[in-house]
Amino acid sequence: MMTRKRPLALLILDGWGYRENTQKNAVFHANTPVLDQLTAKYPNSLISGSGIDVGLPDGQMGNSEVGHINIGSGRIVYQELTRISKAIDDGEFDTNPTLIKAIDDAIKADAAVHIMGLLSPGGVHSHQDHIEAMCRLSVKRGAKKVYLHAFLDGRDTPPRSAKPGLAHFEELFKTLGTGQVASLIGRYYAMDRDNRWDRVSQAYELITEGKGLHQATSAVEGIEAAYTRDENDEFVGSTAIPDAQGNIIKLEDNDALIFMNFRADRARQITRSFINADFDGFKRAVTPKINFVMLTEYAADIKAAIAYPSSDLVNTLGETLQNRDLTQLRISETEKYAHVTFFFNGGKEEPFKGEDRILVQSPKVATYDLQPEMSSVELTDKLVEAIESTQYDVIICNYPNGDMVGHTGNFDAAVKACEAVDSCIGRIVEALEKVGGECLITADHGNAEQMTDESTGQAHTAHTSELVPLIYVGRDAEIEKGGRLSDLAPTMLTLMGQEVPAEMTGRSIIQLKE
């Protein structure tokens, strides 16, 4: 007979920060009776999910990938942004053998170096400083044909903020004496992660064939035309920029294609379209034989050169639970499924022994403000069922609403998103109480608590650096001040009466009173 387990659940409310300022603060304005009651009744605190507390540069807003890696590993993990920026500052970037080989092979073949990535100072998926370093390195090594394919942000940055960056790169290429911005497209198309291949195909055609919905003579002209069409950065339609002689720029055999995004989840689909022989997401008119470089490893099954391979994280929470014969469930919607599995497990794709996974499909809508509750009801149905089954020691669940709806900049929809999650939490807490379980409620980073950019008056669609809540729904206890995301795994193990592995440098911040 199966032993009844009293689960410890970790509920991660994605994009749910705490902000003193209540103006356009969807978390504050939402009617959240369940969380209000839990906060009044149970120990709670605010913890940090940004900057140096999660291995990012000081003051850098947190994000879902970084948050889940820190939570799952129980230690501060120095992020790719920090690691690559440091390599550039130290001069090590210019000696990276993978990057050098790609550039030099292209030069030898009289071929071009194509650089693509999210041209943004956002620091979530990429950083434009890294892209600049790549352009400079290519020219320094003697490349005569250097082409930049710019994916535009407007999601981790204000909705219309791409123009200064594009102008900067046009000036940079003038200074370098060679190179140009060859194409523009919004990240909505190039960086889809939900198998919407009709979007990705537009970016693929633009880069491989030079085919765009629009043409422009310069990047600045291209972005100005997009704004005239009322397209924000994220949604800029594919725009080809021919060279000075009017020739279409396209990816050809022997060219290097260097992808400068360091975050994996939104880099995988487009990468597979370039390098997988058996790719079937859409029909490719051409498949040039290129040297493709990923800045970091996007997935174990993508066979391409990696400039900065990841270092292994051992004894993460998932691995520790496996080693102690404890059972665990990971559950979320499509949008955050990779976060509660791959990222939470420190970049490991395979589930651990005793780890079950439930994926609930996110709704197929253009943007989530059209359905702010997303699939939260179905997710909660499955989660309640899992709790009542009493077969799991630990349950990790992510509700994407605060983040995914927060990114749309739609305040009213973000309020509805928070309200939907609140009612779900009520059902979960009730189910846990029935089986003698407990839960920690927290967030990976802020977003929905700031829906307007006070300096510009534009919608605020990015994450924030605000602290995030932590509520312990369980025994009589106190939560220490000054916690951070990396303290959650050690805290959970301690609550379960388990020893914390030495690799976890976070600390247990909940002291039981009994």
From Swiss-Prot:
Annotated GO CC locations: cytosol
Transmembrane residue ranges: none
Entry annotation: catalytic residues: S64 (phosphoserine intermediate)
InterPro entries (alphabetical): Alkaline_phosphatase_core_sf, BPG-indep_PGM_N, Metalloenzyme, PGAM_B_sf, Pgm_bpd_ind
Reaction it catalyzes: (2R)-2-phosphoglycerate = (2R)-3-phosphoglycerate
GO biological process terms held by the UniProt record: glucose catabolic process; glycolytic process
E.C. code: 5.4.2.12
Binding-site positions, Mn(2+) 1: D403, H407, H463
Coiled coil: none
Pfam families with a match to the protein in the record: iPGM_N, Metalloenzyme
Alphabetized UniProt keyword annotations: Glycolysis, Isomerase, Manganese, Metal-binding
Cofactor note: Binds 2 manganese ions per subunit.
CC cofactor: Mn(2+)
Highest taxon listed in the record's lineage: Bacteria
Residues that coordinate or bind Mn(2+) 2: D14, S64, D444, H445
Enzymatic class: isomerase
Biochemical pathway: Carbohydrate degradation; glycolysis; pyruvate from D-glyceraldehyde 3-phosphate: step 3/5
Family listed: Belongs to the BPG-independent phosphoglycerate mutase family.
Assembly: Monomer.
Listed name of the protein: 2,3-bisphosphoglycerate-independent phosphoglycerate mutase
UniProt organism field: Shewanella halifaxensis (strain HAW-EB4)
